[in-house]
Amino acid sequence: MNDLHVSDSVRYIGADDTTIDLFESQYPVPNGVSYNSYLILDEKAAVMDTVDRRAADKWLENMDAQLQGRAPDYLVIQHLEPDHAGSIGLLLEKFPAMELVGNAKTFSMLPKYFPGDWSSRSVTVKEGDALSLGAHTLTFVMAPMVHWPEVMVSYESSEKILFSADGFGTFGALASGESWDAEAARYYFNIVGKYGVQVQALLKKAAGLDIQTICPLHGPVLREDLGHYLGKYDLWSRYEPEEPESVLLAYASIHGNTAQAARKMKDILEQKGCPRVAFIDLCRQDQAIAVEEAFRCGRAVFMSPTYDGGLFPAMDHFMAHLRDKTWRKRKAALIENGSWAPAAAKVMRGYLEAMKDISLCPTVHTIQGAVKDCDAAAMEQIAAELLS
């Protein structure tokens, strides 16, 4: 049996994409990404999701090799986002007798991507409904807004497999050999992270299932130590930091002065015993990593110059991203730079005050141009407040 296959009856038919540069046209994926799809072979054959059109040829080749002349009876649509549903049209045309399995929201959205009346080929399921394939039975669990409204997951009871849609996914092509942990946090916080309440609801449903294997739509099939992965998702979706004592130091700098101040602040934090400072240049590093670190660390320092009477764009973009991903339950400090009419701290404060459960250090310091000896005392005070 192919190492990628889940079992003799559940076959992996997905495909790697190693030429993609930006996932969702915004997240760098230097090691590519996998579009996972699975085939259950029983008295009835069911395809679990399709793949992005970018990988359709390889996917169809893999599928045909496993079907060996059979036609699938069902296509289960767990998620309509184009990286998983982009090849539905190809399958509808290739197998005219195949039926589509989805929920009411699935079928209300489907014509937006694949115009036409598919009602005669649609099997609508709701929470708890089961679909027998023979020895295998799929039970459907609704997972709205993890991370689209139509999302559902499927539990196969005979082999105790959870087909988890985007849940438990990660970046990286399978051929890269990366572990799940290498990119799972960056994937979660940037793709799913906003929807912690909905992830918690799904985890509560999953707790009632005997799960031995998790089959996500991106990344490796998870077979061992499932408590590790479930525990990570529980922690992340409760917005609790993995490293409560660590500090994200995120800065933007125009001509290097704020960068110099950031290096000084990093030294001060480390001298005061901070176990780890995640030091991120927002102008030059992947902001998705900065978002990941913001959620991993229990504390954060934001350092930015004033620009056009407001906040420098790199910092503005980052703080908007944190707001949109519902960053919360953290302690934060602000340092601005402005030679005249400094305004960066006011804008940053506005972002933070709009977030939930953010404790802001009382000292906010303004650097005027180059960092000077007189700035050190204020930075020492901010570090003490942040680490207390």
PLM regions: where:
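Metallo-beta-lactamase
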Residues: L4-D8, G102-V151, Y195-L203
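FMN-binding flavodoxin-like domain, especially the glycine-rich phosphate-binding loop
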Residues: L174-I214, H218-V221, K264-I280, A290-S388
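Active-site-proximal loop/helix segment associated with metal-binding centers of metalloenzymes
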Residues: H147, V151, G167-K194, S237-E242
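Short N-terminal or domain-adjacent regulatory/targeting segments
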Residues: C215-E243, H317
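Structural motif
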Residues: K44-A46, Y74, H136, K160-F163, ...
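Active-site neighborhood of phospho(di)ester-bond hydrolases with catalytic His/Asp-centered motifs
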Residues: M48-T50, P72-L80, L100-N103, L162-A165, ...
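Active-site metal-binding motif and surrounding structural segment of the metallo-beta-lactamase
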Residues: E43, R54-V101
